[in-house]
C-alpha cells in the first residue's frame, strides 16, 4: 500500500512497515523522554561568527545530529567509514544530516505547566475531569487562588478556592499540617493524579441512576464519558499537565542566514527561547531560595510562555515578534488554509507540470491537445535523456543536457518518439468537478500557447479570453494507463451529474448546425428529387439548389433486421449533408437530423448516437459535426447590426394602457380601497406583465417569416433571432432589454423599484432610468464575487461529508427501498417517473396495471427502454433501491446506487460516489453564482394569482371542503384540499393544492380543456373567512392596545390593524379575537363540532369589518398580508441549498402534528399559546406545542388533524420531518427542495447525488434510553456502533439501548466522522485533535482524505483493488501461518515432552509477523 522507498546503496533504509490504523493519545512524560535525544539547556541557537550550532542550544549538533553528512562538528571524523562513531571531542554522532529532521529534544520544566489545549479548548477536559469551572481553574493556574487538595479533619472542602489571606488564616486556625492546599499547575496535577478512574466511573454511574432534573444528568454524563474515554485509551489525567516539553527537530524550525549577517528564523525558535529562558531563571530562583512571590511570578510567566508555544493567542495577549506580527505557534502550523493539513498534505506542488494560456484548436481530434514544443521539451526531459543515452548519442547525463540545451535536430526527433502515445493531463482552475482534469494525447505545436479542443470547453468551463491551463505528465506506466483508460477526454462524454452528454457543440458550432438545418419556402430547386446524398452535393456545388430548399432525397438507412435500405425523405440539402455524418444504425435514423436543430436537439442527437452506436462512433461523429458547424457558420456569415434589433410598433400603446392602470391603482389607494402594500404589489405586477407583453410582441415580430417582395423567396430569419433561438448566444431576456423594454429593476435589498425602465438600450435610457438601473447592475457584480466564495465553501463541506462514501460491495441485499413518483411543481410535471427511475434498480417487480405483465423484475437495472415502457404504462409510483436505504457497513453497494451516470453502465465497485455527488451538487452552484449578473439585476416574475388547466380531463376533488358565499363563489375552507385532473382511464394527470381562501371556478366532475381557469387566489394577503352567518362581536380588540388605527397620509382613509398587544403594558393577558353571534339571541354561533365560532387575530391583520356588523358565511373577516414579491435568482438559491444541507431550523418554522387527533387550545403561558392534540387513539399521550401569541394559527378548536399536518404555517424543520414522518419523507422533502432551486436555473442534477449526501447526514443515532449498555443518554453514536452494542447486550441478556436516527448538518457530520484525521483537516483542528487524543481514537484510514494525508493510494478506484488483493493475501497468509504453527506444535509435542524450551523464540514463526488484517 505505502509506496516502498527505493533503497539507496549509501543509506539502506528498511522498507516502511505497512500499517492499518493510526492511534493518537496523550504523551506521558516518560514517553516524551523516550523520544528525546537530549535536554536543551540553553536558549542560544547558533554562534553568529562561526555559524556553528551552540552546544546544548536549540540547534545543538550533539543532540540532533551533524550539520553535514558523515562529518562531526569539529571535523575530526569525516566520510562514510566512521559511520556511527561518536566523536569524543564534540560529542556528535557521525551520520546523515537528515536525522536533524527526525530527532527530538526536550526541556525539563522546573514547575509543571497545564497544557492549554486541554485547559482552554471547550469543553475544558481538565475542568470536566476535576468538575471545576474554567474560571476557577485559571485562578489556580495563574496563581490567584489556592485550592484545597486534602481537607484532613478541618471543615474545609476538597476543591475549595481560597485567597492568600484566607489560606494564611486557615493555617493559623487549623495548624500547618492539618490540611493541604496548593497553588498553580502543581496543585492541578496533584488533584488529577489523585483521581482513581475506575472508582470515579462507578460513582458517576451510581449518581446518574439517582439524578433527576434536566441539567444534573447532562453534567454527570459529560464527566462519565470523559472518565470512560480515559479508561479505555489508557491515558492518565495527570498527563494533561506537562512536566517535560518536547522540542521538535531543528530542521523543521530552520534558521536560515540571509546576506548581510541577518537571519530568517521560524517563529517556533522564538517561542522555545522564551520557554527556556524563563525555565532557567526559575531553576536559578529556586536554587537561590528566592521569596515565594518572585518564584510564583516566574512560574506564571513559564505557564504563559508554554501556552504561547502551543497555541499563541488562545489565552491572554498574543505574543508578537520584533515586527509586531503575532508569532506562529504549533497550533497555527496545523490550522487553516495555510496550515500543514490543507497546504502541504492535501494540496501539494507537482513536479513535471507547466502552465500556459489556452487558445482554440479546431483542427485537433477530440483526444488531442496542442502542446508547445518548448513546454514539451522541458516536461519530458528525463525521458529524452534516457532515450539519448539508449541511442548512444550521449554517454552521460551532462552530455545529454548539453544536447537538449542546444536543441539539436535529433532531440526533436526523440521528443516526437517520447511523446507518441504518452497522454498528458490538462487542468483548469477552479477544478469544480472531475471533468476539470482530463487526459489528452499531446501534439507538438509552434508558439507558446496550449491548444484546446473546442468541444471540451464546456466541461472545463473554459473560454479563450486569457484563461490559463496547467499540464501534468503522468510518469509511471500505471499512471499513463489510468490516464488513458479513465481520464481520456474521449472516455468522458457524459456528465457525471446528470448522465447527459457534456461533449456538446456550443456557440458558433450550434449556429452553423442551426443554419444548415433551416428550411425556407420558394428557394431555387424547390421540389427537386435526388437519388443519393452525392447527387445533392453536386447540385449544391453547381448552385442549382440552395442549402435551405425543400427537396426530396433518398437516404441509405438500416432497418431493424440490420439490412441496408433506401428511404425517401422530404428534407433540405443542408440536412442531407448533416445526415451523411450520422453513423448507420437502426436506432439513429435520418429523422434524428431531419428537423431544425437547436442546442437541446443537438445534445439529444449526440446522446442517441452515444447510447446506440457506441463510444468510438460517437466521438468521430462529434468531431465531424464540430467541423461542419464551424464551416457552415463561417460560410453563412451571420452577424447583426443595430437595425436587427426590432422595436415593436405596439410598444407605446401597451405602455400607455398600463400607465392608465397604474393611475387607477393610485386612485384606489387614495380612496382607501387598497393598502399601500397591495398598491405596490399590483403596480409591480402590472409592469412586469407589460414588460412581458412588449417582449412577446417583439419576439413575434422578430421571428415572423419574411418574404422578398420581388422573387417571393422566403428570407433568412433575423440574425439576432437565429442566435438566440438556436441557443448559440444571447437569450430572449437580453433581446428584451435591447429591443423591448428594460423592465423593472431590483434594489440591492431585493425589493423591486416601482417605476420600471420603459426605454430599451436601442432607444437609450433617460438619466433617471439610468440611475435606477445602476442599482441592479452593481448588485450583480458584487454578488458574483461573494457567491463564488460561498459556493466554493459549500462544495468543500459537501466533499468533506461525503468523501468516505465509496461503492464497497456489489449487493447489500436490503429489502428497504424508497418510493419514486413524478415530481410535480405547481401542477405541472417537472420530472416524469421514467426520468426519475432511469438508471436505478427496481426493489420489487413493476407490473403494468393494464396488462398485468412484469415490465421490470426485482433487482433489475432500469435502462432507457424500460423507462420508456414505464412512462407509457399508467404506473403512478414504484419502489426503487436507493443509497439512503443501503445497508452496507461502509459506503454503499452497487445495486442501491444503480447506474454510473458518466459511463451508462452499472456502477463499478470502488467508485467514489460520495465525491462525485458533492461535485455534482457544488459545481453548478459556482456556475450559477458566476452567471447572475448577465441580466443586470432585472426583476423577474410577477405573482401568479390564478391557475389554468394544463391539459384536458375531468375535475375531481380530494378532501373537499367548500363554502358558497353570498355572491355564489365557491371558497375553499379546508387546509389540505386537492384538485385533480383525471383522464378517461381515471389516471391522475395533474394535481393542485388549494390553499385556504381560494376561489374555485369549477365543480366536481366538470370537463375542462387546456387554458380553462380552474381557481384563483389573492397572492398578497391571506384571508380569514367567516364559516357561519351572524353578527360580528370583537373581543379584546382594544383600541390603542391591541388595535391601532392607521391613517394613510395620501388617502385620508383609516384602517384597523391588529397591533402587537404583548408589547403594550396592559395587554399581556388579552386574547384578541372576533366572534360571530346569533342576531336573535346574542349567543355565539356554534360550528358543526359544537364549538363557538371564533377567529383569534394575529399581529398585523387588517380587519375588514366593524363591531356589530352583520356578516354572512363566506365573507372576509380579516386579511393577513403576505410578504411582497422578492426577486428570484440563485442568490436566494445558493444559501437555500446550504441551509438545507446544513439542516438548519428555519426561523418561524412550521409546527407539524406528531399524531392523529383533535386540536385543543390549552391555557396560555406568558406570551405563548398552548395547543395540544388529543390523540384519537386512547392509549397515547396528548402532545403539546407552544406557539407565540399573535402568530396566525390555521387550525381551530376541535379540528381533526392527521400525523404530518401543519398546525402552524412556515417552512418545516427537516428534523421534525425525520422524527415524525420518517427517513423517506425527509429524503423526499430535501430532494424536492434542492431540486427546485436548481430547476429554477435549468440545471439538471440526478436525485441519487442528493440521496448520497442525505445518507451521510443520517449516519448518527441519538440514544434516547441507555438501557443496560455503556451508551449514554443523549450521546450521538454511529448506527453501526449502536447496533453492535445492542446485539452484544441482547446476547448477554441485558436490556438494549433505545435510539432514533438524527439529522446532522454537513459541517457537523464532517466534524463527527469516524476519522479524526479527516475531521481535523476540515475545520476546528485543535478541538478535533484534543478530543481525539483524550479518547485515544484510532483512525482506521477508511475514507479518501485520511489516506491522502498519510500518503497512500486512496481506497477507491484502482487503489481499492490493490487494497482488496492485499486483504485476501493477508487472510491466506494467516491461514498458512496458523497451519504451520499447528504442525510445529504437533511435531514439538511428539518430539519432546518439554515443549517450552524447544519453542523459546517461536522457531521460524518469529520472522513472519504480519500487520493485523483489518476486518
Curated annotation (Swiss-Prot):
HAMAP family tied to this protein: RNApol_bact_RpoC (MF_01322)
Gene3D superfamilies: 1.10.132.30, 1.10.150.390, 1.10.1790.20, 1.10.40.90, 2.40.40.20, 2.40.50.100, RNA polymerase II, clamp domain, RNA polymerase Rpb1, domain 3
Quaternary structure (record): The RNAP catalytic core consists of 2 alpha, 1 beta, 1 beta' and 1 omega subunit. When a sigma factor is associated with the core the holoenzyme is formed, which can initiate transcription.
Binding site for Zn(2+) 2: 812, 886, 893, 896
Family classification: Belongs to the RNA polymerase beta' chain family.
Origin species: Dinoroseobacter shibae (strain DSM 16493 / NCIMB 14021 / DFL 12)
Residue numbers binding Zn(2+) 1: 72, 74, 87, 90
GO biological process entries: DNA-templated transcription
Keyword S-adenosyl-L-methionine attributed: no
Cofactor note: Binds 1 Mg(2+) ion per subunit.
CC terms in the record's Gene Ontology section: DNA-directed RNA polymerase complex
Protein name: DNA-directed RNA polymerase subunit beta'
Residues that coordinate or bind Mg(2+): 463, 465, 467
Stored Pfam families: RNA_pol_Rpb1_1, RNA_pol_Rpb1_2, RNA_pol_Rpb1_3, RNA_pol_Rpb1_4, RNA_pol_Rpb1_5
Cofactor: Mg(2+); Zn(2+)
Amino acid at each position: 500500500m505505502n509506496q516502498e522507498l527505493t533503497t539507496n546503496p549509501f543509506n539502506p533504509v528498511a522498507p516502511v512497515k505497512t500499517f492499518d490504523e493510526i492511534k493518537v493519545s496523550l504523551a506521558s512524560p516518560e514517553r516524551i523522554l523516550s523520544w528525546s535525544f537530549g535536554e536543551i539547556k540553553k536558549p542560544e541557537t547558533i554562534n553568529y561568527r562561526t555559524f556553528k550550532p551552540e552546544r546544548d542550544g536549540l540547534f545543538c549538533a550533539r543532540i540532533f545530529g551533524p550539520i553535514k553528512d558523515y562529518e562531526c562538528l569539529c571535523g575530526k571524523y569525516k566520510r562514510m567509514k566512521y559511520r556511527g562513531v561518536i566523536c569524543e571531542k564534540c560529542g556528535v554522532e557521525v551520520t546523515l544530516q537528515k536525522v536533524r529532521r527526525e530527532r527530538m529534544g526536550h526541556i525539563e520544566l522546573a514547575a509543571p505547566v497545564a497544557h492549554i489545549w486541554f485547559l482552554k479548548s471547550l469543553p475544558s477536559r481538565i475542568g470536566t475531569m476535576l468538575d471545576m469551572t474554567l474560571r476557577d481553574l485559571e485562578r489556580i493556574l495563574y496563581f490567584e487562588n489556592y485550592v484545597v487538595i486534602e481537607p484532613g479533619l478541618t471543615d474545609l472542602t476538597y476543591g475549595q478556592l481560597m485567597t492568600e489571606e484566607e489560606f494564611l488564616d486557615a493555617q493559623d486556625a487549623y495548624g500547618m499540617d492539618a490540611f493541604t492546599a496548593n497553588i498553580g499547575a502543581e496543585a492541578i496535577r496533584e488533584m488529577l493524579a489523585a483521581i482513581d478512574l475506575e472508582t470515579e466511573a462507578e460513582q458517576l454511574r451510581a449518581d446518574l441512576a439517582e439524578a433527576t432534573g434536566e441539567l444534573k444528568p447532562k453534567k454527570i454524563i459529560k464527566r462519565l464519558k470523559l472518565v470512560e474515554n480515559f479508561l479505555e485509551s489508557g491515558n492518565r489525567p495527570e498527563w494533561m499537565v506537562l512536566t517535560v516539553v518536547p522540542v521538535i527537530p531543528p530542521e523543521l524550525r530552520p534558521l536560515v542566514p540571509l546576506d548581510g549577517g541577518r537571519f530568517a528564523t521560524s517563529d517556533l525558535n522564538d517561542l522555545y527561547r522564551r520557554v527556556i529562558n524563563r525555565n532557567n531563571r526559575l531553576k536559578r530562583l529556586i536554587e537561590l531560595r528566592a521569596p515565594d512571590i518572585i518564584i510564583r511570578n516566574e512560574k506564571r510567566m513559564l505557564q504563559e510562555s508554554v501556552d504561547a508555544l502551543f497555541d499563541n493567542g488562545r489565552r491572554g495577549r498574543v505574543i508578537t515578534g520584533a515586527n509586531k506580527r503575532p508569532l506562529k505557534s504549533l497550533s497555527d502550523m496545523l490550522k487553516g488554509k495555510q496550515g500543514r493539513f490543507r497546504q502541504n498534505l492535501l494540496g501539494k506542488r507537482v513536479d513535471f507540470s507547466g502552465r500556459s494560456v489556452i487558445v482554440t484548436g479546431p483542427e485537433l481530434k477530440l483526444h488531442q491537445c496542442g502542446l508547445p514544443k518548448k513546454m514539451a521539451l522541458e516536461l519530458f526531459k528525463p525521458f529524452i535523456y534516457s532515450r539519448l543515452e539508449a541511442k548512444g548519442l550521449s554517454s552521460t547525463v551532462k552530455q545529454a543536457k548539453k544536447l537538449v540545451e542546444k536543441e539539436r535536430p535529433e532531440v526533436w526527433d526523440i521528443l516526437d518518439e517520447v511523446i507518441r502515445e504518452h497522454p498528458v493531463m490538462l487542468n483548469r482552475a477552479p477544478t469544480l468537478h472531475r471533468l476539470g482534469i482530463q487526459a489528452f494525447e499531446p501534439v507538438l505545436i509552434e508558439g507558446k500557447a496550449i491548444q484546446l479542443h473546442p468541444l471540451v470547453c464546456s466541461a472545463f468551463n473554459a473560454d479563450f479570453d486569457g484563461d490559463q491551463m496547467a499540464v501534468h505528465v503522468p510518469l509511471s506506466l500505471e499512471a499513463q494507463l489510468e490516464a488513458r483508460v479513465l481520464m481520456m477526454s474521449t472516455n468522458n462524454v457524459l456528465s457525471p451529474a446528470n448522465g447527459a452528454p457534456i461533449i456538446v457543440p456550443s456557440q458558433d458550432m450550434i449556429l452553423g448546425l442551426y443554419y444548415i438545418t433551416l428550411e425556407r419556402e420558394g428557394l431555387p430547386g424547390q421540389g427537386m428529387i435526388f437519388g443519393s446524398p452525392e447527387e445533392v452535393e453536386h447540385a449544391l456545388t453547381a448552385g442549382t439548389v440552395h442549402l435551405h430548399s425543400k427537396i426530396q432525397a433518398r437516404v441509405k438507412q438500416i432497418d431493424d433486421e440490420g439490412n441496408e435500405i433506401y428511404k425517401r425523405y422530404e428534407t433540405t440539402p443542408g440536412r442531407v449533408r448533416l445526415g451523411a455524418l450520422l453513423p448507420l444504425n437502426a436506432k439513429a435514423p435520418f429523422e434524428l437530423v431531419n428537423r431544425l436543430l437547436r442546442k437541446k436537439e443537438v445534445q439529444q442527437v449526440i446522446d442517441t448516437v452515444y447510447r446506440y452506436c457506441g463510444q468510438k462512433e460517437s466521438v468521430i461523429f462529434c468531431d465531424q459535426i464540430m467541423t461542419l458547424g464551424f464551416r457552415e457558420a463561417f460560410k453563412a456569415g451571420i452577424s447583426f447590426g443595430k437595425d436587427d434589433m426590432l422595436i415593436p410598433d405596439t410598444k407605446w400603446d401597451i405602455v400607455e394602457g398600463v400607465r392608465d392602470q397604474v393611475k387607477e391603482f393610485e386612485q384606489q389607494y387614495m380612496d382607501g380601497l387598497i393598502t399601500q402594500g397591495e398598491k405596490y404589489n399590483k403596480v409591480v405586477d402590472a409592469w412586469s406583465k407589460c414588460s412581458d407583453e412588449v417582449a412577446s410582441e417583439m419576439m413575434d415580430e422578430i421571428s415572423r417569416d419574411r418574404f422578398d417582395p420581388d422573387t417571393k423567396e422566403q428570407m433568412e430569419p433575423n440574425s439576432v433571432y437565429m442566435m438566440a433561438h438556436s441557443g448559440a448566444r444571447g437569450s430572449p431576456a437580453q433581446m428584451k432589454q435591447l429591443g423591448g423594454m428594460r423592465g423593472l429593476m431590483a434594489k440591492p435589498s431585493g425589493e423591486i423599484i416601482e417605476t420600471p425602465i420603459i426605454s430599451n438600450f436601442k432607444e437609450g435610457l433617460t438619466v433617471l432610468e439610468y440611475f435606477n438601473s445602476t442599482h441592479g447592475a452593481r448588485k450583480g457584480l458584487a454578488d458574483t464575487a461573494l457567491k463564488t466564495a460561498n459556493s466554493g465553501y459549500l462544495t468543500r463541506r459537501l466533499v468533506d461529508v461525503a468523501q468516505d462514501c465509496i461503492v464497497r460491495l456489489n449487493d447489500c441485499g436490503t429489502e428497504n427501498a424508497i418510493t419514486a413518483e413524478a415530481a410535480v411543481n405547481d401542477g405541472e410535471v417537472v420530472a416524469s417517473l421514467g426520468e426519475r427511475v432511469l438508471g436505478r434498480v427496481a426493489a420489487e417487480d413493476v407490473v403494468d396495471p393494464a396488462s398485468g405483465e412484469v415490465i421490470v423484475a426485482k433487482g433489475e437495472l432500469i435502462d432507457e427502454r424500460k423507462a420508456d415502457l414505464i412512462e407509457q404504462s399508467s404506473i403512478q409510483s414504484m419502489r426503487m433501491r436507493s443509497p439512503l436505504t443501503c445497508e452496507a457497513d461502509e459506503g454503499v453497494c452497487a445495486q442501491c446506487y444503480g447506474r454510473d451516470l458518466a459511463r451508462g453502465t452499472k456502477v463499478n465497485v470502488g467508485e467514489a460516489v460520495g465525491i462525485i455527488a458533492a461535485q455534482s451538487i457544488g459545481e453548478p452552484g459556482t456556475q450559477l453564482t458566476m452567471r447572475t449578473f448577465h441580466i443586470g439585476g432585472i426583476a423577474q416574475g410577477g405573482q401568479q394569482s390564478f391557475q389554468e388547466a394544463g391539459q384536458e380531463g375531468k375535475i375531481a376533488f380530494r378532501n373537499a371542503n367548500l363554502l358558497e358565499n353570498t355572491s355564489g363563489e365557491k371558497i375553499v375552507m379546508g387546509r389540505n384540499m386537492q384538485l385533480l385532473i383525471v383522464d378517461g382511464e381515471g389516471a391522475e394527470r395533474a394535481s393542485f393544492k388549494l390553499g385556504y381562501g381560494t376561489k374555485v371556478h369549477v365543480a366536481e366532475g366538470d370537463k375542462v380543456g387546456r387554458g380553462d381557469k380552474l381557481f384563483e387566489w389573492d397572492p398578497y394577503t391571506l384571508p380569514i373567512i367567516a364559516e357561519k352567518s351572524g353578527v360580528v362581536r370583537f373581543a379584546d380588540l382594544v383600541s390603542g392596545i391591541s388595535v391601532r388605527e392607521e391613517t394613510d397620509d395620501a388617502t385620508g382613509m383609516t384602517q384597523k390593524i391588529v397591533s402587537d398587544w404583548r408589547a403594550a403594558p396592559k395587554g399581556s393577558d388579552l386574547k384578541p379575537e372576533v366572534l360571530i353571534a346569533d342576531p336573535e339571541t346574542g349567543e355565539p354561533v356554534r360550528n358543526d363540532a359544537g364549538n363557538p365560532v371564533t377567529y383569534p387575530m394575529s399581529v398585523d391583520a387588517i380587519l375588514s369589518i366593524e363591531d356589530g356588523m352583520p356578516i354572512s358565511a363566506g365573507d372576509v373577516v380579516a386579511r393577513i398580508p403576505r410578504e411582497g414579491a422578492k426577486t428570484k435568482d440563485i442568490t436566494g438559491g445558493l444559501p437555500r441549498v446550504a441551509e438545507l444541507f446544513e439542516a438548519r431550523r428555519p426561523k418561524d418554522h412550521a409546527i407539524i402534528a406528531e399524531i392523529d387527533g383533535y386540536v385543543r387550545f390549552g391555557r396560555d403561558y406568558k406570551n405563548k399559546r398552548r395547543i395540544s392534540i388529543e390523540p384519537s387513539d386512547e392509549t397515547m399521550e396528548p402532545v403539546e406545542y407552544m406557539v407565540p401569541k399573535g402568530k396566525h394559527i390555521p387550525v381551530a378548536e376541535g379540528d381533526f388533524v392527521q400525523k404530518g399536518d401543519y398546525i402552524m404555517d412556515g417552512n418545516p424543520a427537516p428534523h421534525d420531518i425525520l422524527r415524525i414522518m420518517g427517513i423517506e419523507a425527509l429524503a423526499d422533502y430535501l430532494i424536492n427542495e434542492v431540486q427546485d432551486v436548481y430547476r429554477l436555473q435549468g440545471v439538471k442534477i440526478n436525485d441519487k447525488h442528493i440521496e448520497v449526501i442525505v445518507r451521510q447526514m443520517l449516519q448518527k443515532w441519538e440514544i434516547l434510553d441507555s438501557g443496560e449498555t455503556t451508551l449514554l443518554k443523549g450521546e450521538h453514536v454511529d448506527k453501526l456502533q449502536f447496533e453492535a452494542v445492542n446485539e452484544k447486550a441482547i446476547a448477554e441478556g441485558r436490556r438494549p439501548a433505545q435510539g432514533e436516527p438524527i439529522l446532522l448538518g454537513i459541517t457537523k457530520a464532517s466534524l463527527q466522522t469516524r476519522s479524526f484525521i479527516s475531521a481535523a483537516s476540515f475545520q476546528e483542528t485543535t478541538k478535533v485533535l484534543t478530543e481525539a487524543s483524550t479518547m485515544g481514537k484510532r483512525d482506521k484510514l477508511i475514507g479518501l482524505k485520511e489516506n491522502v494525508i498519510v500518503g497512500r493510494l486512496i481506497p477507491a478506484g484502482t487503489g481499492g483493488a490493490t487494497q482488496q488483493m492485499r486483504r485476501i493475501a493477508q487472510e491466506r497468509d494467516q491461514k498458512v501461518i496458523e497451519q504451520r504453527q499447528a504442525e510445529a506444535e504437533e511435531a514439538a509435542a511428539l518430539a519432546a515432552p518439554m515443549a517450552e524450551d524447544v519453542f523459546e523464540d517461536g522457531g521460524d514463526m518469529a520472522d513472519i509477523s504480519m500487520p493485523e488484517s483489518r476486518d
